[in-house]
């Protein structure tokens, strides 16, 4: 019994020291030279959590409607992550002082680089799961389609819908010397165009795609349960908004802005708490972009 207890005591007190010397890396964990334990970086740990949320969207044992909800939660989480956590790291990178995370010793630059690599992998996975979900929605009578799958008659019908119900509420803009780049709101969709003038000069056009008047999902009248995105309709007929230009390239863009704001710089003794929070929100909505 005494010998057995001695062995247990040895394992309890000495084995961690042996493991400490031999353990260099475990999964995503990185050994900090000044630490007694092996840690996983906070940001990478959070991305692993969000990946588990995404995995639920692909889990066949979960009801389809809930899987769609999980996919939506994943995207919302990722937006908030970039706004707050990546925004904080971007702010640290802009400072002259080199700031390192105290658990793993990773600098702000190293964390951002690792985060972007992981997010690219997650976005590929998300696209695959999205296609899977869309395929499973078809037997339920719901389908998201694009212009390539529409007949000529249906395309003409959507063009009429664009002329009457979408175009009147759009505000097309052109970036030029006399017209600097407009402010792009956080998490909003924009149609971005490379335009060519009659003299051969290149200009950039921007069309905000969000509007409270028309819906984002528009049902095809001849196909009940078949929908098309309003931004795709805008992008398809956007040349009608720029009749004097030739459109060379076009795409949909979405900006995610930094939401990491220091309240001390906005504090004013003459303002009450409500006014101070209003100023904070206004300033927060106009911080620099962290993702496009």
Q: Which ranges hold each PLM region?
A:
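Short, Lys/Arg-enriched N-terminal segments with co-localized hydrophobic residues
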Residues: 11-30
């Amino acid at each position: 019994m005494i010998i057995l207890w001695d062995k247990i005591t040895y394992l309890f007190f000495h084995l961690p020291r042996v493991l400490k010397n031999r353990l260099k890396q475990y999964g995503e964990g990185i050994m900090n030279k000044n630490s007694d334990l092996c840690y996983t970086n906070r940001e990478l740990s959070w991305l692993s959590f969000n990946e588990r949320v995404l995995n639920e969207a692909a889990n066949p044992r979960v009801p389809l409607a809930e899987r769609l909800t999980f996919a939506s939660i994943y995207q919302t989480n990722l937006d908030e992550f970039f706004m707050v956590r990546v925004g904080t790291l971007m702010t640290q990178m802009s400072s002259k002082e080199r700031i390192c995370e105290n658990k793993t010793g990773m600098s702000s630059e190293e964390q951002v680089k690792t985060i972007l690599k992981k997010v690219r992998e997650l976005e590929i996975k998300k696209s695959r799961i999205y296609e899977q979900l869309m395929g499973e929605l078809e037997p339920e009578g719901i389908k998201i389609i694009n212009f390539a799958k529409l007949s000529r008659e249906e395309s003409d019908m959507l063009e009429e819908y664009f002329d009457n119900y979408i175009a009147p509420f759009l505000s097309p803009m052109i970036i030029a010397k006399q017209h600097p780049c407009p402010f792009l709101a956080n998490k909003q969709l924009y149609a971005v165009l490379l335009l060519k003038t009659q003299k051969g000069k290149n200009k950039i056009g921007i069309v905000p795609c969000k509007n409270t008047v028309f819906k984002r999902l528009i049902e095809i009248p001849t196909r009940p349960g078949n929908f098309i995105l309003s931004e795709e309709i805008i992008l398809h007929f956007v040349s009608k908004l720029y009749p004097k230009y030739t459109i060379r390239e076009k795409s949909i863009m979405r900006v995610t802005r930094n939401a990491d704001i220091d309240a001390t710089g906005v504090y004013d003794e003459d303002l009450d708490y409500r006014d101070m929070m209003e100023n904070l929100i206004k300033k927060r909505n106009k911080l620099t972009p962290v993702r496009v």
